[in-house]
Regions:
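Structural signature of eukaryotic scaffold interfaces centered on beta-propeller domains
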Residues: 271-292, 345-363, 423-431, 491-510, ...
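The canonical Cys-X-X-Cys-His
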Residues: 176-187, 236
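A short, solvent-exposed loop/turn motif at the edges and junctions
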Residues: 64-70, 92-113
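Short, ordered, surface-exposed loop/turn motifs in non-cytosolic proteins
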Residues: 42-44, 50-66, 90, 139-155
């Protein structure tokens, strides 16, 4: 394993209300026209200056509600403070300046086709400037237990659970695989205690009440129980108390530099205020010209059965209802809850389908992991069935299944799977095999659908298969009888592991299936289906070496290298070709190939009391731009910067930060890239993502703020149109 030193250039923002005089806020009445700023009828351009002179690397934001859905476009200024916002739809816009070291300027009303110079406003003090910092800078102020406090000795000892052997395990819970899994921490909404929560003797009591708010209370209380709850409440209370007393982040974000100033960001509202999104999809991952200029589809998971659809050409958002096969399918509306300080005592989520992840196929149809019925499986999945997969490893239940939506006909096809589903990806094979992950490791299986067979026969039973994950610990290269996970390795047999994929990807070079396994330290697993799966399927397991731990989402590049974010604050790559020792046999059980790993520290500060490499970043997923749909090159891995409020692209060992400065609180769980016109240069391509926090009411704007589709484009320079 090697650790890469990754420098980065960061950017951020978010708004606060500041009272300023009209002279500070007015735009220049007679702009000085710079010949380098060449605007057309749909553009806006000009210069941004403050009391300090031209402001380089700040954002100019244009927003309108004149279109069928809210529309926002954002660009950065060049090194002389000049800007150009290209291709604005015809409408009236509010335009203002945001940037580090500044406070928001007054919003100026204007229309496209004009030169508009803007006066930026220097922040009057450090506290006013810090209000615009990304969440990671505030979350890094959280003090965590010292390394010397571990291992945990339980309630009769130091209070820390015995299961927590190290500080790194504690961090895994308060970052990607626990407290940060579903929403951001460090934003304005979470670094303060809302008065609507109630009156409490101290902040520890307030935090204990806070985490049981709403319909996610069970998940949040289960996560806090993994820590020492009294100590955790005390540390989070100390964090918010220090901030309330005026303490500020120790480090400051940098403004956009280099190519970061060439980024154009476009946003559209596309969901209801009580809905949250998990993912979006714009094209076929294998062929990113599919669905060119077409509709964008989203998955609202536990919040609603209405999946959002955005028309980015006509700026319209609509919804389609996903059905279930069994009307008695449980709904998230039934989740236990305590009143929310934002929404009161009633539930706001109501979903039977739990749509999690979408994927386009080459025919322009959208496939979903969604719930079809109750968890109890039909008989063909269970022990005693003649189904080939059930004979090898019967399954009693599955909490999510598959569905397919055909936009041309409006038809929705439901597919009941025996195996649980979470994410999905199509293979580049003759069967267009649809591989799925299960989410948590408990099911112990990976499942797939032979799409060619399903389309030919409509038989969902015969078209699906699944397998347990079996390691070739006897080293003979084939699948044999195996020992169970709780039994020691037997050199004459194989061994089953209790694992299932969270992220899932297909190696385009050899067709093997790779996935991440949640937990500490977590794993990536390679599944070779063999010639007759599931009977021939064999797995290999690889554990990230410290200081790396806690993988979550993942992807693979065209060279077969796996990329995954780690809870340790790294973007990790794993290249199996670098392994020097045996890849099967009794010693190939996880820690046998540290040389295959490279850890790239994410940008941003580290949490307090943490001396290990990495950062406070809690990245959720990684996606590889295999076909250069953005403009930074082929095979560029991009992580979701959930605390950085950005996408984080690794280019030649350095991170390029694609930050979304408005509205503050960008939190993505997925992205994809689409080529609308291969002959149109930068205008014909782009990345797509969405605000995927479960708490859109924590985003700048508060209650009523909705999830947004975000498009990223990369110009050759900040004034290109």
């Amino acid at each position: 394993m090697k650790t890469a030193r990754a420098s980065y250039v960061g950017i951020v923002a978010v708004g606060i209300a500041v009272l300023l005089t009209a002279s500070q806020l007015r735009s220049t009445a007679q702009p000085t026209i710079d010949p380098a700023i060449r605007i057309g009828a749909s553009d806006l351009g000009g210069r941004v200056t403050s009391a300090n002179g031209p402001e380089a690397g700040v954002w100019v934001i244009a927003e309108t509600t004149d279109l069928p859905t809210r529309f926002i476009k954002i660009v950065a200024t060049d090194d002389r403070g000049r800007y150009l916002i290209p291709e604005l739809p015809k409408a009236n816009y509010s335009v203002w300046v945001r940037g580090y070291g500044l406070v928001d300027s007054t919003k100026v009303r204007t229309a496209p086709g004009k030169f508009l110079d803007l006066n930026a406003v220097v922040a009057p003090n450090a506290a006013a400037a810090a209000e615009y910092y990304p969440a990671i800078y505030w979350y890094s102020m959280l003090k965590v237990p010292e390394k010397s406090d571990f291992p945990g000795t339980g309630p009769q000892g130091n209070g820390i659970p015995v299961a927590l052997k190290s500080q790194t395990q504690w961090l895994d819970v308060v970052k990607t695989n626990g407290c940060y899994t579903c929403h951001q921490l460090g934003n304005k909404a979470t670094r303060a205690i809302p008065k609507e929560l109630g009156d409490f003797k101290n902040s520890e009591e307030a935090w204990a009440r806070r985490i049981v708010s709403g319909q996610a209370m069970t998940q949040m209380t289960n996560n806090i129980k993994r820590l020492d709850p009294p100590r955790a409440y005390k540390l989070f209370a100390d964090w918010t108390d220090r901030i309330a007393a005026g303490e500020l982040p120790a480090s400051k974000p940098a403004r956009p530099q280099g190519v970061e100033r060439n980024i154009v960001i476009t946003l559209w509202d596309w969901a209801g205020p009580k809905d949250y999104l998990h993912d979006e999809i714009s094209t076929d991952k294998r062929k990113p010209t599919v669905n060119a200029n077409g509709l964008i589809y989203g998955t609202p998971e536990e919040s609603t059965d209405l999946f959002p659809v955005l028309d980015p050409v006509n700026h319209k958002a609509t919804q389609v209802k996903m059905p279930v096969r069994d009307p008695n399918t449980p709904s998230s509306k039934q989740n236990p809850m305590t009143p929310s300080p934002h929404w009161g005592p009633g539930p706001i989520w109501d979903s039977q389908t739990s749509m999690h992840n979408p994927m386009f196929d080459e025919k322009g149809r959208v496939w979903f992991t969604s719930r079809v019925g109750a968890p109890a499986n039909p008989d063909f999945c269970k022990k005693g069935s003649e189904h080939p997969s059930a004979k090898l490893f019967p399954l009693e239940e599955s909490n999510r299944h598959l569905s397919m939506y055909d936009p041309k006909t409006g038809k929705i096809t439901l597919i009941r799977t025996c195996f649980p589903t979470h994410h999905l990806v199509f293979a580049e094979d003759a069967n267009n095999t649809l591989w799925t992950s299960a989410g948590g490791p408990g099911s112990g299986v990976i499942g797939w659908l032979n799409r060619k067979m399903f389309e030919a026969t409509g038989d969902e039973q015969k078209s699906q298969s699944w397998t347990a994950l079996i390691l070739d610990t006897n080293g003979n290269g084939k699948r044999d009888d195996y020992v169970e996970p709780d039994q020691p390795v037997d050199p004459t047999k194989d061994k089953r592991v209790v694992a299932a994929f969270y992220g899932v990807g297909v190696n385009p070079l050899d067709g093997t299936i790779w996935g991440t396994v949640l937990g500490f330290p977590g794993y990536v697993i390679r599944l070779n289906p063999g010639s007759n799966p599931p009977a021939t399927a064999l797995a290999e397991v690889f554990e990230p070496p410290l200081p790396g731990y806690g993988p979550r989402g993942m992807d693979i590049d065209r060279n077969g290298v796996v990329w995954t974010p780690l809870s340790s604050g790294h973007l990790a790559s794993f290249d199996r070709r670098k392994c020097k020792g045996p890849l099967n046999g009794p010693t190939a059980t996880g820690q046998h190939c540290p040389e295959g790993w490279t850890l790239h520290p994410y940008p941003g500060p580290q949490l307090m009391n943490v001396t290990d490499p990495g950062s406070a970043e809690a990245s959720y997923y990684a996606w590889v731009d295999q076909f250069d749909t953005f403009g930074l090159g082929r095979n560029v891995p991009i992580g979701t910067g959930n605390a950085n409020e950005a996408l984080l692209a690794l280019v030649n060992g350095k991170f390029v930060v694609l930050r979304v400065p408005y509205p503050m609180g960008f939190y993505a769980k997925w992205m994809d890239g689409r080529i609308d016109d291969p002959n149109a240069g930068w205008k014909g391509k782009g990345l797509w993502s969405t605000y995927a926090t479960r708490t859109p009411f924590h985003v700048e704007g508060g209650k009523g703020t909705t999830s947004k589709v975000v498009k990223f484009q990369l110009r050759p320079d900040p004034l290109a149109r």
